[in-house]
């Protein structure tokens, strides 16, 4: 086993709150346990999930204080007992879940995947959460094929951008992206049909652009009543993917009122109606995906 030496710096959320709560602290170097690797972190991704963790809205977060950081890219500097899939010096991307905002992090070796030398750490650190989630939804769950249509909410965000790129690669015939007006040019630069989320009804747009049928796939990170409207945008046989709860977040601090409104407005889907319309509703949370073979397959495909 590789023993920890010296100290490292890491970011800590000591309690729920605004950005003023963020701390940088020193701690002992970690030592990889059996089945783990230790990674020197070169880059770490910043996601909406980390914002929700700080505000106390992320249900699977550890108790405070804790170190956030869902995804990292770096090099292996140590292995615990029984690890033979990786070696010192390997360049990897890793789904850390928590703890990634540190100079070094130990994690289950099955959640670290080697990357080619041609892929920079800058790019690699953005793969696990945004592109992993997008790939899992459209390719693994949705089995998307050329010519299908897609609705993307928060289209200018990390997952929205990744979904749009995957749609283009898979040959989608129409990609509709909702966002605020200032983001129109960016959304359209990715090949999407822009919908102003404040001034247009995306359900009507989806129906009008598909001869009244609706889209094949709808990507919703909002929740609440918004999720039901996304469902109404689907055609028969369509698929809805729910992977976030942005409706619960307003500004830089936790809002109990926003949380209540989101959960109160959550739809209840009738299995009989799902069956009769051949529709599907998926809940997606890559951080809680327990099948490492699926997860690693996604990362391996995306990093090449």
Where are these regions (language model features)?
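Glycine-rich beta-strand-centered segment in the early N-terminal region that forms part
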Residues: 28-46, 57-99, 221
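NAD(P)H dinucleotide-binding glycine-rich loop of Rossmann-like/cofactor-binding domains
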Residues: 40, 52, 63, 91-154
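Short glycine/proline-centered loop/turn elements that form peptide/ligand docking sites
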Residues: 80-85, 177-186, 198, 224-226, ...
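Local beta-strand N-terminus motif with an aromatic residue
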Residues: 89, 147, 191, 214-215
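Mid-domain Rossmann-like dinucleotide-binding core that forms the NAD(H)/NADP(H) cofactor-binding site
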Residues: 125-200, 204-205
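Glycine-rich phosphate-binding loop and adjacent beta-alpha segment
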Residues: 172, 225-303
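A glycine-rich helix->loop->beta "capping" turn
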Residues: 209-217
